[in-house]
Amino acid sequence: MKSSFSVVIAGLALVFCVPGARADIGINPRVGLLGYGIEISAGVSDRLSLGVGFNNATRKRQGTTEGVDYEYDLRLRSGEVMANFHPFAGAFRLRAGALLNRNEFILTGRPGGSGTYDFNGTTYTAAQVGTLTGKLSFNKSAPYLGLGWGNRPNGSWGVTFDLGAVYQGKPKLSLEATGGTATPPTLAANLEAERQQAEEDLSSFKWYPVIQLGLYFRF
């Protein structure tokens, strides 16, 4: 979290050091698949602005991976530095930049309906496994490409819309079972095989879609 704030602070310093940028400042609160966020931008010309922002949200989901039920605590936290190019000096814009990506899934395993887990073809009771936890994380530096509408330099106020994608790389999965009664080496080996297979199943999740809707005010 502190790293995300550091990116925003450094980005603000860079944006406001751009010659002529102080004359046109935009504030853009928004909500979308990156969470609740805000961007502060400075117009460099009638077609270009530079912005920094921060996104944050927590969401809970449930699902099944490799036959194991999980509760997912999705933590969305990212800082961003963006360039917004308005090719026609109007509302339409092309958008590119980078995120300091702290997005992650915190996983808590739940036994199936029979009260058991199945790891790598071996069945364990809930008592044998104990507490099953994990984390799904991504590249910390993630480029962004997209297009959007609104928040043009020298504008006044209005609605913004963004559609794009973040390249976050292959997900990295960790799993750990603690406090159980199963023989540690055997459980650890099967849990590692389960982790590798689940990570492979998730390997195509390299791009994170971005849809955002917000308001902008420029002064």
Each PLM stretch: what is its role?
Residues N84-F88, R93, W157, F205-F219:
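Outer-membrane beta-barrel "beta-signal"
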Residues F54-V81, N103-S141, G169-V210:
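Extracellular/periplasm-exposed beta-strand and loop segments of Gram-negative cell-envelope proteins
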Residues C17-V18:
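N-terminal signal peptide c-region/cleavage motif recognized by signal peptidases
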Residues I25, Y36-I38, L48, R77-V81, ...:
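Hydrophobic, lipid-facing positions within transmembrane beta-strands of outer-membrane proteins
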Residues M1-I9:
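Bacterial N-terminal signal peptides that target proteins for export
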Residues A23, V44-L50, F88-G90, P153-G155:
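Short coil turns and loop connectors of transmembrane beta-barrels in diderm outer membranes
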Residues V31, A42, F85-P87, A98, ...:
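Residue-level signature of outer-membrane beta-barrel architecture
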Residues I27-L33, V52-N56, L94-R102, F161-Y167:
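Transmembrane beta-barrel strands of outer-membrane/channel proteins
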